[in-house]
């Protein structure tokens, strides 16, 4: 069966690569694995061997039929659905597992949506392993003063320890995509989350500050509080130069700035 371009389907079949990807997961057998976009089941085949429970979410009815014909495992559940429309928290609540991880050969066209959906339930997860476009993987794992550093980099760092695992050459897929991919892992923790009262508001705060990377942090902060003098006062309090641009602040500075702004009556 041919890959469907509108679903962003690119398949892998190399057994060594499959094992290497699955190896990135925590290898504790007693856990729930949620696989997003299993396609023809290349990763699924290895996952059902290693873990107690595997739930796969596949939007394509044709792929679901292939999966049902290929697998007859009592530890596998196949769900046909658009993952962006599923309540993952409700899905997870059906199972009694302390360790829960997500793995996905992520369709390029919905990468950000899947990442942010995963981050929203980070408190329920142990780890997530994603195959992404190499450029996006580098962005997620980047730090301040790096060209591709943005609000997605900070969001992933806020909820997890980010690791750039390895590059996957585009020739390992069929059909061959235009760019190389990479595997990243997110190991979830609450180190930064404990430092603020509203994580969703923080993520939105950072997103707005990155809306225009060419403007200074002062101008972008002014877009939020609508008071340039007050914005300058906040930055001076934290010894943050008003001439810096969004990519020149690290996550600790963003957390301090958020806490200062939202504990004041701006």
UniProtKB/Swiss-Prot annotation:
GO terms for cellular component: cytosol. It catalyses: adenosine(1518)/adenosine(1519) in 16S rRNA + 4 S-adenosyl-L-methionine = N(6)-dimethyladenosine(1518)/N(6)-dimethyladenosine(1519) in 16S rRNA + 4 S-adenosyl-L-homocysteine + 4 H(+). Keywords: Cytoplasm, Methyltransferase, RNA-binding, rRNA processing, S-adenosyl-L-methionine, Transferase. Its EC number is 2.1.1.182. Specifically dimethylates two adjacent adenosines (A1518 and A1519) in the loop of a conserved hairpin near the 3'-end of 16S rRNA in the 30S particle. May play a critical role in biogenesis of 30S subunits. Belongs to the class I-like SAM-binding methyltransferase superfamily. rRNA adenine N(6)-methyltransferase family. RsmA subfamily. NCBIfam families: ksgA. CDD domains: AdoMet_MTases (cd02440). It comes from the Bacteria. GO terms for molecular function: 16S rRNA (adenine(1518)-N(6)/adenine(1519)-N(6))-dimethyltransferase activity; RNA binding. It is found in: Cytoplasm. Gene3D superfamilies: Ribosomal RNA adenine dimethylase-like, domain 2, Vaccinia Virus protein VP39. S-adenosyl-L-methionine binds at residues 10, 12, 37, 58, 82, 105. SMART domains: rADc. PROSITE patterns: RRNA_A_DIMETH, SAM_RNA_A_N6_MT. Pfam families: RrnaAD. This is Ribosomal RNA small subunit methyltransferase A.
């Amino acid at each position: 069966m041919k890959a469907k371009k509108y679903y962003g389907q690119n398949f892998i079949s190399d057994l060594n690569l499959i094992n290497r990807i699955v190896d990135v997961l925590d290898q504790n057998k007693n856990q729930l694995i949620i696989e997003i976009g299993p396609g023809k089941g290349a990763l699924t085949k290895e996952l059902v061997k290693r873990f107690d429970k595997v739930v796969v979410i596949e939007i394509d009815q044709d792929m679901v039929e292939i999966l049902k014909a290929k697998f007859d495992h009592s530890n596998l559940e196949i769900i046909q659905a658009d993952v962006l429309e599923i309540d993952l928290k409700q899905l997870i609540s059906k199972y009694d597992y302390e360790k829960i991880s997500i793995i996905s050969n992520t369709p390029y066209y919905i990468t950000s949506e899947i990442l942010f959906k995963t981050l929203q339930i980070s408190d329920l997860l142990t780890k997530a392993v994603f195959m992404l476009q190499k450029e996006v993987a580098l962005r997620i794992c980047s730090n301040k003063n790096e060209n591709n550093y943005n609000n997605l980099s900070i969001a992933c760092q806020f909820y997890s320890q980010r690791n750039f695992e390895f590059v996957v050459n585009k020739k390992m897929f069929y059909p061959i995509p235009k760019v190389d991919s990479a595997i990243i892992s997110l190991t979830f923790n609450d180190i930064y989350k404990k430092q603020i009262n509203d994580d969703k508001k923080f993520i939105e705060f950072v997103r707005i500050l990155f809306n225009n990377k060419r403007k200074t942090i002062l101008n972008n902060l002014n877009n939020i509080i609508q008071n340039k003098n007050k914005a300058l006062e906040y930055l001076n309090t934290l010894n943050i130069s008003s001439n810096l641009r969004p990519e020149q602040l690290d996550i600790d500075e963003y957390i301090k700035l958020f806490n200062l702004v939202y504990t004041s009556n701006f």
